[in-house]
């Protein structure tokens, strides 16, 4: 990779997008950050995510909607695009809300690919472990047949299909990354760890869906960013998992948070939510072999960093 490049980062004001944008700017690259500031969570949270970036010389923020705005001007002199913008959330993707997922996860991706195809700009697409559904293969390799069990997972898979279609038919150099449960500072307020930390620290009940023995491959945001940046040099048309290859139960996470915060959790058990899967685990053999990816942050250390950042906000 050249010493300096110009990147487009969609979803730049979000949890992962803001960390990725910072890492790129810190390496001396120029970043055009795009975000439409949906009402999924409060605008001030996203603006806080951008606090350091907005002071950086190499960062420019553009507020626009990928599903309807003019995209060609955003791509001027851009050499690589990271497409992280999406409507997140498994549990919120049912019913009337589904139209938002179609617009932001499918239509927006198709329009960006259209804009990229004439310029042959490389795109790294942020997909999700949700496309696998309740996989019986654990750890789950990339060649596992996708069977999403939520509308959210279905829209992320459809966006992957669009990426392949534009790669196959127009030669758009796309690389797909399937992120496994990301956590860390700036985690969205609707996500489990953010809710657990807020509840435990304030002595309030925290909701746990099911028995808490469901296991996830929890991946620290810094490791996600590292893997994403390595994908700049990946072969177009490839798809990689980004995780740790290790799993932890929700009950174990809660016990660790109790130790870090110094308070006992008040757990409220609820029925398993629609679209939730029992276990996830990333097989990271391919990305480790091809790109040299190595996750470096233990869950305990990552949780300590998230607790510190969240309680200091």
Feature annotation, model-predicted:
Residues 1-182:
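N-terminal Rossmann-like NAD(P)+-binding domain of SDR-like oxidoreductases, especially those catalyzing
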Residues 15, 125, 132, 180-183, ...:
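Conserved hydrophobic/aromatic "anchor" residues
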Residues 20, 200-313:
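C-terminal substrate-binding subdomain of Rossmann-fold SDR/epimerase-dehydratase oxidoreductases
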Residues 93, 143-145, 172-185, 196-219, ...:
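A conserved pocket-lining segment of Rossmann-fold NAD(P)-dependent short-chain dehydrogenase/reductase
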Residues 106-114, 190, 222-225, 229:
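Conserved active-site region of classical short-chain dehydrogenase/reductase
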Residues 112, 166, 195-200, 227-231:
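A short, amphipathic alpha-helix embedded in the catalytic core of nucleotide-handling enzymes
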Residues 158, 162, 166, 196, ...:
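Hydrophobic alpha-helix immediately C-terminal to the catalytic Tyr-X-X-X-Lys motif of short-chain
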């Amino acid at each position: 990779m050249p010493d300096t490049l110009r990147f487009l980062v969609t979803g730049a004001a979000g949890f992962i997008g803001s960390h990725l944008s910072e890492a790129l700017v810190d390496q001396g690259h120029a970043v055009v950050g795009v975000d439409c500031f949906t009402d999924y969570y409060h605008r001030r949270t996203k603006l806080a995510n951008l606090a350091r970036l907005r002071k950086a010389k190499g960062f420019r923020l553009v507020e626009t909607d990928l599903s309807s705005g003019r995209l060609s001007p955003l791509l001027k002199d851009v050499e690589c695009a990271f497409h992280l913008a999406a409507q997140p959330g498994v549990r919120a993707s049912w019913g009337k809300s589904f139209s938002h997922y179609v617009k932001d996860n499918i239509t927006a991706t198709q329009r960006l690919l259209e804009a990229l195809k004439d310029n042959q700009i490389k795109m790294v697409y942020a997909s999700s472990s949700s496309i696998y559904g309740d996989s019986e293969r654990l750890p789950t390799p990339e060649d596992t047949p996708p069977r999403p069990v939520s509308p959210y997972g279905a829209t992320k898979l459809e966006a992957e299909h669009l990426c392949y279609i534009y790669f196959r038919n127009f030669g758009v150099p796309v690389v797909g990354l399937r992120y496994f449960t990301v956590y860390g500072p700036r985690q969205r307020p609707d996500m489990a760890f953010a809710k657990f930390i807020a509840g435990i620290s304030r002595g309030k009940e925290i909701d746990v869906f099911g028995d808490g023995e469901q296991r996830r491959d929890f991946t620290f945001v810094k490791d996600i960013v590292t893997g994403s940046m390595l994908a700049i040099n990946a072969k177009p048309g490839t798809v990689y998992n980004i995780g740790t290859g290790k799993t932890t139960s929700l009950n174990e996470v809660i016990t660790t948070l109790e130790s870090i915060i110094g308070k006992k959790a008040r757990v409220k058990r609820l029925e398993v939510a629609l679209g939730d899967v029992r276990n996830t685990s990333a097989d990271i053999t391919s990305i480790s072999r091809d790109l040299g990816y190595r996750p470096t942050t233990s869950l305990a250390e990552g949780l300590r960093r998230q607790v510190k950042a969240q309680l200091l906000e």
